[in-house]
């Protein structure tokens, strides 16, 4: 459970970073 929870948190963080990156790319 701990491992899966950690990976889920990493996935959410990666998804957020990807969305932010794409947003910055669109504004440029």
UniProtKB/Swiss-Prot annotation:
Its main location: cytoplasm. GO terms for cellular component: cytoplasm. Disulfide bonds: none annotated. Gene3D superfamilies: Histidine kinase-like ATPase, C-terminal domain. It is found in: Cytoplasm. Keywords: ATP-binding, Chaperone, Cytoplasm, Nucleotide-binding, Stress response. ATP binds at residues 5, 21. One of its GO terms (molecular function) is ATP binding. Putative molecular chaperone that may promote the maturation, structural maintenance and proper regulation of specific target proteins. Homodimer. Belongs to the heat shock protein 90 family. This is Heat shock protein 81. It comes from Pseudotsuga menziesii (Douglas-fir). The lineage of its organism: Eukaryota, Viridiplantae, Streptophyta, Embryophyta, Tracheophyta.
């Amino acid at each position: 459970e701990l491992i899966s929870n950690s990976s889920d948190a990493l996935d959410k963080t990666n998804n957020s970073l990807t969305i932010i990156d794409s947003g910055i790319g669109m504004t440029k």
